[in-house]
Amino acid sequence: RKLKEREEKTGQKMPKAVLLFTVCLHHFLGCDLERIYRELEQRFPEIRFLRCYMDPIMQKHGPTPDQKLRKAMYEPLNPDRNKMDTKQISILGSDFALDLSCDLKELLAIAGYKVRELQDCSTWEEYEELGNAGTFLCCYPSGKYGIETLAERLRRAFLYLPLSFDYEEIRSEEETLWNSLGVEGKQILSEWMEKKIALCEEALNHAKQIIGNAPITIDYTFHPRPLGLARLLLIHGFNVKTVFLDSISPEEKEVFEWLKVNAPKLELRATVHAKMRVLHEAHPSEKTLAIGQKAAWSTGSHYFVNLVQGASLQGFDGIRRTAELMEEAFLNEKDPKTMIVRKGWGCTSCI
């Protein structure tokens, strides 16, 4: 009713899709959600109602609300098979578009592939074009479940190349990509990767000269591989003191074991602990570089990298950019209380 009233009053057309979130209360009350969705679809056949969930009571098993949301976002994709473009790759599953300078986009451009991302879409028609890709690629762990499901449903190729700070893992992922594209010239790829690694080493060494032995803290909101970043920095001589995280990702178990042996004094702190609310009141006695918002808030540091979820960083280029961001953060003071409280991009409500 409100949708129709808005259309009559403002002339604003009905949305093509609505992300409808149900919460814990609906489950407690035993709501017949399927009937609700069925009724909505009958009343508004021109609108796709996407089944989204904000039900943390269900997080003990099965996909998380975040994983289910990233799956729901692509359920309307059901393109005409005649339009499938084998030279198009859709990179999906993350909240951020990858940098133009990232490894994936550079390699795909060399191979003559067209890249599409959700963040580039400004119309429904552009969104639908995402489904015409011959291959779906995901880099973000929480997006893997949804994008793999999408690829299976549309019977397309799927590649999971997770974000990483490990040279050998990145090398393996990019060889996998290169081979899947059927591009000749492995020597070209090898030489290209060596140049990228050299740029990483140069950036890390320069950052070390600037940051010196200043203590560094990292948190899991900065990147899905916080322990991998800690290992990379420790190997390059940085003074990493603490990693804030609430669990060890299966993708980081090998790194965790390495840190236990090679960095036994490294602290791992849970962010869900009640005392973390006031930990920032004990300001650091020395200049501390915080990598991530929770690390900045928890340490009270005014020198922090203000970035979440790995953002647009990927591959060897992502390592280089991380070193540059660390250097920039260490040289420029920011107030965490005025920056970190800003959450979300904002979204138009259908009601």
List PLM regions with ranges.
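An N-terminal assembly and electron-transfer interface module characteristic of large anaerobic redox
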Residues: 1-351
